[in-house]
Design a protein with these regions (language model features):
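N-terminal, intrinsically disordered, polar/charged segments of Gram-positive cell-envelope systems
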Residues: 3, 13-81
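A short, surface-exposed interaction/processing loop segment used at functional sites
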Residues: 27-40, 112-132, 188-200
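Sec-dependent N-terminal signal peptides
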Residues: 1-7
Length: 200
């Protein structure tokens, strides 16, 4: 009787170990699969994250002159500043227009050229010297290429406006490659680099 109980105990123990071994094996496989999946997800996320911060010159769909035309249909003012940046999670042009006593801002989606947002506000410091026509200056793609000759990154943002310190119209360009960022200021008439700084 005692030997039968011992034998039963051994069989149960063996079954328990066998089951446990299989469970461990399954757990290990599941864990490995989960880790692999997470690794895949992480790399996808970081890739997407990286891409969402910058845009390649060739991927910009709407040209600045078209964005300005669209903005002027929405608000009848003189062009004061144009900038290209991430707005509400989308690449967009922010067009600032001015007229006596008022300023307007129109945001244009770069992907489809449609208006995302527009606003106006009372403004007393109207300054005719800050108004310009985009076509009077070097096109933005020429400016970006000049900056890229010095630092081969993708576009993080750029803008064109009158720089009061320089006393002239200037393109400000931010390029990014990985974690490195470079900021440029270029003369809008000549494309001469006025400033080139590493942004840490």
């Amino acid at each position: 009787m005692l030997s039968l109980l011992v034998a039963s105990g051994l069989v149960l123990a063996a079954c328990g170990q066998g089951g446990s071994s299989d469970e461990n094996k399954n757990d290990s496989e599941q864990k490995a699969n989960t880790e692999q999946k997470q690794k895949g997800d992480t790399s996808g996320t970081s890739e997407t994250g990286k891409n969402s911060n910058v845009i390649k010159l060739g991927d910009i769909k709407t040209q600045p002159e078209d964005a300005v035309k669209t903005a002027k249909k929405e608000y009848d003012g003189e062009l004061k500043e144009i900038s290209f940046e991430k707005e509400q999670g989308k690449w967009a042009y922010k067009i600032d227009l001015q007229k006596q006593g008022e300023e307007g801002e129109v945001i244009i989606n770069s992907k489809d050229g449609k208006v995302m947002n527009k606003s106006t506000e009372k403004e007393d410091d109207y300054d005719k010297a800050k108004s310009f026509k985009y076509e009077d200056f070097k096109p933005y793609d020429e400016i970006i290429k000049k900056a890229k000759d010095n630092f081969n990154g993708d576009i993080h943002e750029w803008s064109l406006s009158r720089d009061s310190d320089e006393g002239k119209f200037v393109y400000d360009v931010d390029l990014q490659k990985g974690n490195s960022k470079q900021e440029f200021s270029l003369d809008a008439k000549t494309a001469k680099i006025l400033k080139n700084e590493k942004d840490d």
